[in-house]
């Protein structure tokens, strides 16, 4: 009963990203990504710094099909004792959990759905590692508008008003480039 032709998960490196086909889940996932170091002056820890992984993706499952721009953050805090760690955690801005991500193409907001990721934490009395973020999901025709846009603006919304920020021109252009690369694959 062992078949030479049994289905298996395949991963293919394309020109700009990676395509994974899973016959067991009947799913297709395409991913291309870039690492950004965001430095902003808002928040109680000023200026705050964080590394964002920006992932442009296509995902097709029996339940859904979408194109997306995903933000993942990682942060490690260190303190000499528990009390100092508690103060650091309280001062950490709420921007790391994405509540909304707005893309404006030629002055018009693109229709999208935002999914927030639950924070994952690994904490001891002197260190705290955490991961967070979210994803804006688009239909193909709206996603294509990003690559064709003559003017493009993007705004990230975290969980409070201190956590909103506009992406700078070079960051927007990098994401536009990732979108174009994904569509080209």
At which residue positions do the language-model features occur?
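A generic "folded-domain core" signal
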Residues: 1-185
